[in-house]
């Protein structure tokens, strides 16, 4: 488990972000928010993929008015993304939003910020301050000459002070940049400057392939320093892909206790089975499991079991047959044509055992 810096806990709907809680995966819808049916359908797909908090754009009154209808039909906390118009924030709060993303300094005069803060306080709704290297305040750019980590932290502290002066402390902060090195430095400095939870992201990271690599490089470095309480992988792709990448990234650092992991070999000339298609099929099969099962798909019956001793269950293919093994020990041989189905059956059994065990632990803790 990667050490994580403790921050103050902040409630978002039925979740708590920060403190000693697990890192939360977020995404954002691509639909027009006023199209309630399309927005709800996309949120449900995101939830099924493992998304825990979802953000919607609220650019106008139609979008703000849709919040209440959307909230009635989804199960995960909903965040309103607001720019400039404080009235949209008030309407979203009235509609039952679980968190508001604003920059207090961009909302306008103090009485407007105060109106949003008072409404958020009354409903117990947190505010996320979204600092972005691409939209820093003019005076900060004039001071530093260009976007810098120090400038981003100064911007964050400025917005934090506005809220703290109004005795508001349910704050989450993001420090996003499209430059990986700048984002890493900004998050490091932010983690030292204040103890509010940090929402991680590399903004405008790119397409599915390039954006995945860029986000993994930047966010991986930040996570490895024990920084971060919630994250979004920003991709020019179906937002479900953002959630999949986020889950894989967290698994890599031992930060996801409710996700399945696939171990598969890179293939070589010794392989006698269609390992690539089998690995893809198994990966898809386990993608929505909410238990920490490790599954191995290997192409060599000689080295396979030994190479995946940590796997809960796996197969190693050979000509015409496969070895089914648990924790590195061979359980039985199965014909090649049914080995994937046999593996799936074993996965189902182990996943059910793990789920029952977790439920039992939960009941014990509640007693």
UniProtKB/Swiss-Prot annotation:
Required cofactor(s): [4Fe-4S] cluster
InterPro entries associated with the record: Dihydropteroate_synth-like_sf (IPR011005), IspG_bac (IPR016425), IspG_bac-typ (IPR004588), NO2/SO3_Rdtase_4Fe4S_sf (IPR045854)
One Pfam family named in its UniProt record: GcpE
Residues where [4Fe-4S] cluster binds: 265, 268, 300, 307
Cofactor, how bound (note): Binds 1 [4Fe-4S] cluster.
Keyword annotations of the record: 4Fe-4S, Iron, Iron-sulfur, Isoprene biosynthesis, Metal-binding, Oxidoreductase
GO BP field: isopentenyl diphosphate biosynthetic process, methylerythritol 4-phosphate pathway; terpenoid biosynthetic process
EC numbers, comma separated: 1.17.7.3
Reaction equations catalysed: (2E)-4-hydroxy-3-methylbut-2-enyl diphosphate + oxidized [flavodoxin] + H2O + 2 H(+) = 2-C-methyl-D-erythritol 2,4-cyclic diphosphate + reduced [flavodoxin]
Disulfide feature: none
Pathway connected to this protein: Isoprenoid biosynthesis; isopentenyl diphosphate biosynthesis via DXP pathway; isopentenyl diphosphate from 1-deoxy-D-xylulose 5-phosphate: step 5/6
Function: Converts 2C-methyl-D-erythritol 2,4-cyclodiphosphate (ME-2,4cPP) into 1-hydroxy-2-methyl-2-(E)-butenyl 4-diphosphate.
HAMAP family xrefs: IspG
UniProt similarity note: Belongs to the IspG family.
PANTHER family: 4-HYDROXY-3-METHYLBUT-2-EN-1-YL DIPHOSPHATE SYNTHASE, 4-HYDROXY-3-METHYLBUT-2-EN-1-YL DIPHOSPHATE SYNTHASE (FERREDOXIN), CHLOROPLASTIC
Protein name: 4-hydroxy-3-methylbut-2-en-1-yl diphosphate synthase (flavodoxin)
Annotated organism of origin: Bacillus anthracis
């Amino acid at each position: 488990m990667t050490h994580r810096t403790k921050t103050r806990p902040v409630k978002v709907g039925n979740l708590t972000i920060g403190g000693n809680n697990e890192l939360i995966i977020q995404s954002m819808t691509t639909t027009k928010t006023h199209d309630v049916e399309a927005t709800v359908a996309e949120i449900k797909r995101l939830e099924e993929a493992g998304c825990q908090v979802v953000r919607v754009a609220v650019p106008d009154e139609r979008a703000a008015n849709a919040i209440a209808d959307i909230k009635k039909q989804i199960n995960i906390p909903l965040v309103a993304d607001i720019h400039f118009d404080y009235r949209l924030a008030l309407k979203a709060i009235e509609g039952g939003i679980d968190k508001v993303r604003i920059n207090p300094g961009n909302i306008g005069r103090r009485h407007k910020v105060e109106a949003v803060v008072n409404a958020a306080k009354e409903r117990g709704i947190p505010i996320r301050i979204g600092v972005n290297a691409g939209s820093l305040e003019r005076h900060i750019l004039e001071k530093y000459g260009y976007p810098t980590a120090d400038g981003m932290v100064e911007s964050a502290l400025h917005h934090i002070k506005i809220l703290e002066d109004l005795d508001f402390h349910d704050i989450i902060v993001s420090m996003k940049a499209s430059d990986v090195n700048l984002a890493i430095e900004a998050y490091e400095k932010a983690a030292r400057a204040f103890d509010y939870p940090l929402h991680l992201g590399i903004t405008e990271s790119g397409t599915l392939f390039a954006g995945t690599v860029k986000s993994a490089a930047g966010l991986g470095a930040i996570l490895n320093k024990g920084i971060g309480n919630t994250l979004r992988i920003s991709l020019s792709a179906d937002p479900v892909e953002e959630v999949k990448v986020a889950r894989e990234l967290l698994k890599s650092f031992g930060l996801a206790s409710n996700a399945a992991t696939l171990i598969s070999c890179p293939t070589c000339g010794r392989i006698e089975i269609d390992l690539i298609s089998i690995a893809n099929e198994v990966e898809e099969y386990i993608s929505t499991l909410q238990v920490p099962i490790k599954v191995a798909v290997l192409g060599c019956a000689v080295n396979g079991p030994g190479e995946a001793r940590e796997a809960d269950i796996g197969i190693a293919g050979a000509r015409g047959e496969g070895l089914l093994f648990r924790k590195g020990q061979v359980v039985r041989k199965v014909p090649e044509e049914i080995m994937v189905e046999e593996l799936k059956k074993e996965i189902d059994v182990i996943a059910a055992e793990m789920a029952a065990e977790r439920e039992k632990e939960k009941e014990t803790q509640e007693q």
